[in-house]
A protein has these predicted regions:
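N-terminal glycine-/serine-/threonine-rich phosphate-binding loop
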Residues: 1-50, 59-66, 77, 181-186
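Short beta-strand segments
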Residues: 8-10, 50-51, 110-115, 191-193
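Short, active-site-adjacent cap segments at secondary-structure transitions
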Residues: 13-15, 54-58, 117-121
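Aromatic-enriched hydrophobic runs in primary sequence
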Residues: 21-24, 85, 194
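Ligand-binding beta-strand-loop-alpha-helix segment within the catalytic cores
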Residues: 67-189
Length: 194
């Protein structure tokens, strides 16, 4: 087996600000990652890519909440929004990589929607710290807080306020054996996003 390199892509590097939230903007952002991965593959590494999803999962969750409030559609739990963003972001990265890998014909990228096992008593459930979604002004935050008293917000890097959710310490990646098998078969794996 070749040397394994794990490349971590921040969700905030895919959506840099509120003006860059579209799928088109995100697809452009991951193209640079694909170019870097192609260079690494030329150096004969096996590669696993993982990615954050803070802005994306917050948008998906808020979209589901608005659809519930306005249209009575069922709420989507946060865990399902995480899986949705793993698939969506993974698809964008996979597509960008496969487009660049196609002329070389050897490797293919594949996305694995990944679950992690956590401790149900993890303090992260009591004290959420993971910023998600868009940035809000102080007034917007106050309005959202009044409408949703159980939500928590933090000021994030001088750019505004963001909602925070639990981010417990992962204990085990459930799909680790499948990821390992895919690497051994020569795939570039995109997994453990979130």
């Amino acid at each position: 087996m070749k040397e394994l390199v794990v490349v971590a892509i921040g969700g905030n590097s895919i959506i840099k600000d509120n003006a860059s939230q579209s799928i088109e903007h995100q697809a452009e952002a991951v193209k640079a990652v694909a170019d870097t991965v192609l260079e690494m593959l030329a150096s004969d590494y096996d590669i696993v890519l993982t990615h954050g999803n803070g802005p994306q999962v917050g948008l998906d969750l808020r979209r589901a909440e608005i659809a519930h409030e306005r249209e009575g559609l069922p709420l989507t739990p946060l865990a399902n929004c995480v899986a949705d963003t793993q698939g969506g972001i993974g698809y964008l990265i996979q597509q960008a990589l496969n487009n660049r890998l196609a002329p070389h014909g050897e490797k293919k990228a594949v996305t694995v929607v990944t679950q992690v096992e956590v401790d149900k008593n993890d303090p992260g459930f009591v004290h959420p710290t993971k910023p998600i979604g868009a940035f809000f002004s102080e007034n917007q935050r106050d309005e959202l807080q009044k409408a949703n008293p159980d939500w928590r917000f933090v000021e994030d890097a001088g750019r505004g306020y963001r909602r925070v959710v639990a981010s417990p310490e992962p204990k085990r990646i459930v799909e680790a054996p499948a990821i390992k098998a895919l690497i051994q078969q020569g795939f570039v794996v995109i997994g453990a996003g979130g």
